[in-house]
A protein has these predicted regions:
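Active-site microenvironment of metallo-dependent hydrolases
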Residues: 1-24, 29-34, 45-47, 366-475
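Divalent metal-coordination and catalytic microenvironments
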Residues: 8, 26, 31, 59, ...
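Active-site gating loops and adjacent loop-to-helix segments of metal-dependent hydrolytic enzymes
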Residues: 77-110, 158-179, 242-267, 289-292, ...
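Alpha-helical scaffold segments that flank or form the walls of functional sites
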Residues: 79-149, 183-200, 451-453
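Metal-coordinating catalytic core of metallo-dependent amide/deamination hydrolases
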Residues: 141-277, 281-283
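Histidine/acidic-residue-rich catalytic or RNA/ligand-binding cores of hydrolases
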Residues: 242-255, 282-288, 304-316, 332-350
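His/Asp/Glu-enriched, well-ordered alpha-helical/loop segment
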Residues: 262-269, 314-400, 416-417
Length: 475
């Protein structure tokens, strides 16, 4: 299938030079970009008769598909369920854990589908999921059906709290925790061997673990080593809050990143989620190891993680680290809209440090596209509009009020636009969102089922006004 999208008003390529093409045309052949350039040049190189489909792009602007570097598909049914007054540790141990324990395999599949449908409406074409709480097969099959590009795995942890926290049960403990690191690693290896490379390589499977206190140091180090042996990656939460860092220092004499680094747990195949509480020397350790970071600005804002006060993301990027953006789970980040994260990161460090040169629109867009792709080990194939790369892209409707009028398209994408003006989202050379609908799923039926299942999960989890909003778990 050869497709010509001609006379685009602009194309933000996010290539090495951040080239902005005005009056551009793009040739898509099957699942890849075959030619990109000025419309007049493309017309001279390709006969119109050679195309199976020609799309008038004169009212469209094109950007690379957005890449969500940290998301929880298993959490999608928890939208706006947890209180608005939780710090990170209370949110995890007293609300998220009981919720996850109540999610069945069928719930998880429905949550994954509705999460991915929302992603497509928001221009996201690729994601890194923390992993299934139940049967990975169901989530993999959901990704295959919806058509997104993604990475998933089997969620793993191996350190139980010394005492069962309020609201937890022994059944819940068995659901969440493997008996030890070795059994967790065996399951991770099986999962990777079963599912990595599904759907012609569009779906990858990693050795993902929860990270931080619910995982032993052996599991942190072992997951990365296993991933290296299998030729895949791993991701986990670490340094997610100053509270976590202080507990780590009191218990182990080191902050979280330094502790894992001392044990040999950092590496180029590791994506650390959040990474809010780090010291300067830990940035050096991560940079030297090639470790990547997924920053979730909206979660930091809601859970008071302190990114604007103690976060060192500008320093990480200045050191040469790949820092992508993530939406996290909807109970923390609010939704699957990576454009919201892009807007936040473009401006939050300007404001908190009173330095208007920090981050900005150009860097924010790179974080949401190419740097996210590099973090996920997919930088050679996606993340920018370049010949030979996969045809994953977003078309904005420039006849929308968000674009009437506009000057600099780069600033307009980051500061002015929203998913409301997204006309189409393409993955692998296929338009998965167009005409106001996701074409691979019955969205109305999906929303109805998601609402029903969400209410049942919350009831089974016992999440009520009596659920604690502070915690001493793992202290």
């Amino acid at each position: 299938m050869r497709t010509l999208i001609e006379n685009l008003e602009f194309a933000l390529t996010v290539d090495r030079n951040d080239t902005v093409l005005a009056g551009a045309s793009v040739v898509v052949e099957n699942d890849r970009f075959r030619d990109i350039g000025q419309a007049v040049d493309i017309a001279g190189r390709h006969s119109r008769d050679s195309f199976d489909r020609i799309i008038d792009g004169s009212r469209f602007g094109m950007v690379p598909g957005f890449i969500d570097s940290h998301v929880h598909l298993s959490e999608t049914l928890s939208r706006a369920v947890f209180p608005d007054c939780l710090s990170t540790r209370a949110w995890v141990f007293h609300w998220a854990k009981p919720f996850y324990a109540a999610v069945t395999g069928e719930d998880e599949v429905v949550g994954a589908k509705i999460g991915m449908a929302e992603m497509l409406r928001c221009g996201t074409t690729c994601f890194l999921d923390m992993g299934a709480q139940n049967d990975v097969r169901g989530v993999v099959e959901a990704i295959e059906k919806i058509g997104l590009r993604g990475i998933t795995g089997r969620h793993a942890a191996d350190v139980r709290p010394e005492q069962i926290p309020p609201g937890w049960t022994e059944e819940m403990m068995r659901h969440h925790f493997f008996p030890d690191a070795k059994s967790a690693l065996r399951e991770l290896e099986k999962t990777v061997k079963d599912f990595d490379g599904t759907a012609g390589g569009r779906i990858r499977c990693w050795c993902n673990i929860e990270g931080k206190e619910p995982c032993s140091l052996e599991l942190h180090v072992g997951a990365r080593a296993l991933a290296e042996k299998l030729g895949v990656g791993t991701t986990y939460h670490l340094a997610t809050s100053i509270e976590e860092a202080k507990v780590s220092e009191r218990k182990h004499g080191k902050w979280p990143v330094a502790r894992v680094a001392a044990a040999g747990g950092l590496g180029a195949n590791l994506v650390i989620a959040h990474c809010v509480a780090v010291e300067d020397q830990e940035i050096v350790l991560m940079r030297d190891a090639g470790t990547k970071v997924a920053f979730c600005p909206a979660t930091s804002v809601k859970l008071a993680k302190g990114a604007t006060r103690i976060g060192k993301y500008p320093e990480m990027m200045a050191a040469g680290m790949d820092v992508g953006l993530g939406t996290d789970g909807v109970s923390a980040g609010g939704n699957m809209n990576l454009m919201r994260q892009t807007y936040l990161v473009a401006g939050m460090f300007k404001d908190c440090r009173m330095d208007s040169t920090l981050v900005g629109a150009r860097k924010a867009l790179r974080m949401a596209t190419l740097e996210g792709a590099k973090a996920l080990g997919w930088g050679d194939d996606i993340g920018s509009l370049e010949v030979g790369k996969k045809a994953d892209f977003v078309l904005f409707d420039l006849d929308h009020y968000e674009w009437a009028p506009y000057g600099d398209p780069l600033q307009a994408v980051v500061y002015s636009a929203s998913p409301a003006s997204i006309a189409q989202t393409w993955v692998d050379g296929k338009a998965l969102y167009c005409g106001g609908q996701v074409v691979t799923v019955d969205e109305r039926a999906l929303r109805t089922e998601a609402r029903r299942r969400a209410a049942d999960v919350v009831k089974r989890a016992g999440l009520t006004g009596e659920t604690p909003t502070v915690t001493t778990t793992y202290d």
